[in-house]
Design a protein with these regions (language model features):
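Catalytic cores and adjacent binding grooves of peptidoglycan-active enzymes
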Residues: 31, 42-50, 89, 94-100, ...
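Second-shell loop/turn segments in exported
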Residues: 59-65, 117-127, 163-164, 190, ...
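An acidic- and aromatic-residue-enriched active-site/binding cleft used to recognize and process polar
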Residues: 145-153, 193, 255
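Mid-length scaffold segments of soluble, non-membrane domains
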Residues: 124-132, 136-148, 156-189
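Active-site acidic/histidine clusters and adjacent loop/turn architecture
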Residues: 60-150
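N-terminal secretory targeting signals
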Residues: 2-81
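Short catalytic/ligand-gating loop segments at beta-alpha or beta-beta junctions
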Residues: 148-157, 235, 239
Length: 262
């Protein structure tokens, strides 16, 4: 594991490091590695508690594999998995779809009424994110979770060139999960139950909620299993910063071979 000393590092060092990661993983950057690294450094504002890893088997991980799929190949995989979806149209999204059913018995949805949700842009996802969520749903199913309430997947960007493909929420490649509901109706709320602290470690040795309540431990177990399985390239939690106090940001990042957890 490579530990970043913080955003106080010179951006040039971070760029060189990111280039080395992409090279050793054999990943194809979406754009030039230097521009990509600079943008990601600004976007994620990496701090002392964040850690970025570049496993040698990155190409074999779900997130990296999904990030390299074409629209046709991705939709073919959805069909193969018997995932219900319809193709959508969405600016900046490479493979926009809308789910029409649960994933392994888990419903991913916003808080809106069904009539609103049917046309809500926030429920549009890039197909590649859906594949990662389908894997994530297997973890959730093992914890008796049947519903995930999220704030958004896609956020339509403003003043966007029609031929430009977005990342994160602009590209519908990230989900902000706020609440997890089990089959008994119990709600695990990230805001109230995660019990983290800004700058604290999220997963791995020495990482633990404080206090370590049963609900906090369940949330941590769910999240860290997803981290261990490399389902998402970027995982941000309440340990990251105040704007993430109430949700997990789960993101597939196309064209990279690294993983950022905070």
């Amino acid at each position: 594991m490579v530990r970043l000393a913080g955003f106080v590092l010179a951006i040039g060092c971070f760029v060189a490091f990111a280039c080395a990661l992409a090279s050793s993983a054999g990943a194809k950057p979406v754009k030039s590695a230097s521009k990509s690294a600079k943008k990601r450094a600004r976007r994620h504002d990496v701090s002392t508690a964040a850690h970025i890893t570049n496993p040698r088997d990155a190409a074999d991980t779900p997130a990296v594999h999904y990030g390299q799929l074409s629209q046709d190949d991705c939709e073919a995989e959805l069909t193969s998995r018997q995932i219900g979806f319809v193709r959508e149209t969405a600016t900046a999204v490479m493979a926009p779809v809308r789910l029409t059913g649960p994933l392994h018995g888990v419903v991913f949805r916003t808080d809106g009424k069904d009539a609103v949700r049917a046309t809500s842009p926030y429920e549009i996802a890039d197909c590649r994110l859906v594949l990662a969520l389908d894997d994530f749903a297997q973890i959730l199913e093992s914890h008796d979770i049947v519903e995930v309430r999220h704030y958004s997947m896609y956020r339509p960007p403003r003043h966007w060139s029609e031929d430009k493909i977005g990342a994160q929420h602009d590209g519908a490649l990230a989900l902000d999960a706020g609440r997890f509901i089990d089959r008994e109706g119990k709600v695990l709320d990230v805001d109230h139950d995660f019990h983290g602290a800004i700058g604290a470690k999220t997963c791995g040795d020495g990482a633990a909620p404080r206090p370590a309540t049963p609900d906090a431990l369940t949330l941590r177990a769910i999240l860290c299993e997803a981290v261990d399985r490399r389902l998402f390239n970027v995982v941000l939690t309440p340990n990251y910063n105040r704007p993430h106090h109430n949700h997990f940001h789960l993101e597939v990042t196309a064209g990279v071979g690294w993983f950022l957890v905070h």
